[in-house]
């Protein structure tokens, strides 16, 4: 039977290609050279989705996430303070670079902490591996020696896809100078045992013992496949840049065999753009959107939904414009289908339910969460001036176990209105009356008639009843309905248009409506 989701497909592929195992290892990782952006998150959640699919099929899974923080600090991000100071750390391991924002930890660790803090919010809890600690504790000493002993084979594997071939005096390691801490070094000799001789641009020369030094590491194209073997990695995806023909993944597939291992099952995931900005996201400029930023507007469930509902090899945009409303509507539909409140054709139902299931940070609720449209929340949050308790009181029949998720959604609506909603979507009920427009007598009469109707019928009148009455009153007073609508909006929110008027009046209530309109009539 066809699998319900792409994550289930890859879970089956892993088990088929790697055979029965007591424990499957899935892996992800990043160099924390800047803010870990939402494009990087695509890899993490892709691995998490496959890990869940494996677990759901009855397998045990180890999910490792490597902080490649022993990589070199190559460029100072533009958003960091004390640029001059940071420039002095170029070519050192990023774990040595200070965090000039907090001055409490290293630059790398600050970026790691920020990301680690928000992963559990979306239900992701990997085992983090600090690669600087691995190298400085000599965990990879035997792997480094193995690489040096197999220099010729590694050189041939790398040269297969290189236009300019590696020189004869190339070594499969890089060295941080123990005097200046930079990698501006040249390896001069390896004695075929444990001693490496190097010289640095700073003038330092010395010999290092592979077994005890903190200063030697493998270059990334060798380090990555070495760790596949070391950690027994069964699955690791990579971006389309790594999966290009002759790219790093092709090279690594050959190199892992030299280390007497096998390449993991993989797939290529595509780039993410931010709606309205376009292009590939990069950490180096510092101008990026992080998981934290996305969670300001999207609940954890909807954040996961963005990725679970999209095939990994598909490029997509994360929207902060009006598309946010549509994305929430789509998620709510999947939720109704999952809980059987809404029906869909059988062939779609299984896929929709699986996407919803994988969108949950943890287990789905036993009953359907409280459903209220994001557009509606955006309106009522402004009417009640972002007062959570007033919003909850307005929304009827909210159960105690539904409150947490609902409050989260309300906060996302509040944040979206404040930071991203178009100006014509924003409003506030009029509280000052110093720029009042003088109404014609027939308009005053029409407003009074509408007020009388509402006073008599507010509790029983539907939105459609109010809408019909507005049209009726406008015509009876020789006012174009479009003009009458504009006048009412202008009175209520000092704008010529706003939320659907009849529903808007129902939400603000007769008392507030009368208080504002009475100033004009």
Curated annotation (Swiss-Prot):
This enzyme's EC code(s): 6.1.1.6
MF (Gene Ontology): ATP binding; lysine-tRNA ligase activity; tRNA binding
InterPro entries per the UniProt record, alphabetical: aa-tRNA-synth_I_codon-bd_sub2, aa-tRNA-synth_I_CS, aa_tRNA-synth_I_cd-bd_sf, Lys-tRNA-ligase, Lys-tRNA-ligase_SC_fold, Rossmann-like_a/b/a_fold
Short motif ('KMSKS' region): ranges: 280-284
Compartments in which it is found: Cytoplasm
A Pfam match: tRNA-synt_1f
Enzyme class: ligase
CC annotations in GO: cytosol
Record GO biological process: lysyl-tRNA aminoacylation
Motif 'HIGH' region: where in chain: 32-40
Reactions accelerated catalytically: tRNA(Lys) + L-lysine + ATP = L-lysyl-tRNA(Lys) + AMP + diphosphate
HAMAP family membership: Lys_tRNA_synth_class1 (MF_00177)
NCBIfam families the UniProt entry points to: lysS_arch
Leftover remarks: Able to charge E.coli tRNA(Lys) in vitro.
UniProt protein name: Lysine--tRNA ligase
Organism in which the protein naturally occurs: Borreliella burgdorferi (strain ATCC 35210 / DSM 4680 / CIP 102532 / B31) (Borrelia burgdorferi)
High-level lineage: Bacteria, Pseudomonadati, Spirochaetota, Spirochaetia, Spirochaetales
Gene: lysS
């Amino acid at each position: 039977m066809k699998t319900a989701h792409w994550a289930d497909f890859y879970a089956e592929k892993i088990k088929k290609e790697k055979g029965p195992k007591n424990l499957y290892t899935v892996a992800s990782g990043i160099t924390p050279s800047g803010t870990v952006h939402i494009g990087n998150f695509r890899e993490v959640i892709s691995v998490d989705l496959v890990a869940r699919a494996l677990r759901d099929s009855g397998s045990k899974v180890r999910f490792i996430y490597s902080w490649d923080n022993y990589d070199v600090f190559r460029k100072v991000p533009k958003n960091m303070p004390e640029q001059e100071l940071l420039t002095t750390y170029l070519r050192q391991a990023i774990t040595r670079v200070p965090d000039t924002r907090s001055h409490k930890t290293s630059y790398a660790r600050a970026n790691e902490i920020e990301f680690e803090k928000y992963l559990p919010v979306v239900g992701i809890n990997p085992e983090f591996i600090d690669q600087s600690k691995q190298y400085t504790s000599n965990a990879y000493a035997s792997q480094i020696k193995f690489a040096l002993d197999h220099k010729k084979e590694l050189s041939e594997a790398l040269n297969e896809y290189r236009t300019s071939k590696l020189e004869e005096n190339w070594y499969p390691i890089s060295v941080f100078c123990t005097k200046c801490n930079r990698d501006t070094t040249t390896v001069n000799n390896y004695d075929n045992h444990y001693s490496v001789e190097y010289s640095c641009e700073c003038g330092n020369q010395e010999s290092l013992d592979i077994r005890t030094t903190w200063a030697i590491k493998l270059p990334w194209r060798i380090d990555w496949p070495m760790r596949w073997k070391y950690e027994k990695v069964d699955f690791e995806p990579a971006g389309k840049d790594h999966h290009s023909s002759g790219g790093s993944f092709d090279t690594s597939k050959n190199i892992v065999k030299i280390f007497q291992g096998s390449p993991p099952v993989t797939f290529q995931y595509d780039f993410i753009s931010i709606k309205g900005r376009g292009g590939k996201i990069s950490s180096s400029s510092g101008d990026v959107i992080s998981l934290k930023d996305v969670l300001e507007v999207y609940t954890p469930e909807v954040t996961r939904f963005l990725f679970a509902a999209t095939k990994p090899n598909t490029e997509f945009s994360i929207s902060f414009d009006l598309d946010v409303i549509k994305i929430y509507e789509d998620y709510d539909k999947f939720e109704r289908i999952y809980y059987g409140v809404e029906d869909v054709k059988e062939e779609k139902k299984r896929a929709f339910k699986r996407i919803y299931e994988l969108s949950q940070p943890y287990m789905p609720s036993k009953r359907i969460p409280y459903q209220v449209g994001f557009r509606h929340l955006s309106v009522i949050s402004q009417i009640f001036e972002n007062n959570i308790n007033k919003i909850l009181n307005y929304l009827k029949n909210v159960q105690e176990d539904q409150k947490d998720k609902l409050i989260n959604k309300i906060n996302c609506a509040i944040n979206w209105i404040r930071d991203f909603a178009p100006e014509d979507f924003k409003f506030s009920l009029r509280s000052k009356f110093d720029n009042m427009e003088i109404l014609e007598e027939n308009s005053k009469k029409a407003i009074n008639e509408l007020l009388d109707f509402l006073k008599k019928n507010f509790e029983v009148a539907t939105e459609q009843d109010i809408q019909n009455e507005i049209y009726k009153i406008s015509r009876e007073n020789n006012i174009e309905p479009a003009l009458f609508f504009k006048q009412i909006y202008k009175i209520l929110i000092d704008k010529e248009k706003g939320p659907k008027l009849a529903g808007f009046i129902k939400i603000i209530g007769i008392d507030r409506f009368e208080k504002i309109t009475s100033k004009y009539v």
